[in-house]
Amino acid sequence: MILSTEQLYAIDPDVIVLPTSNGYHPASELLNSSDFEKLEELKAIKNKRVYAMPWSPMNCARRVEYPIDILIIAKAAYPQLFSDIKVHKFVLDFYKDVYGVSEEQAKALRSEQILDWTVEYDF
């Protein structure tokens, strides 16, 4: 569903979580790009509560990394309930446990999933 600027302002979301099935869109794109200046008064943008999902192929809605997707949405929507969890650390442990990879390999996987923003924002 594509929303107009007017529809977005009518909703005025507290949080925006960007999907990645049609291409990756980092939170910084909405927060910093002049292409989105008309949206700067939205609560989510003013409060810097814009997040991006991990990259996922269009045909993989229920892949093994699905718990990461759920955690990002939960922490974005309810930061006070998940303040003790850092997604960037959870992701490393997840990859090590699920795939049996080293710390360095887990970091490479996190980067491939385009989740380095979680480190940058300490999310």
For each feature predicted by the language model, list its residue ranges.
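N-terminal ligand-binding lobe of clamshell/alpha-beta domains
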Residues: M1-F123
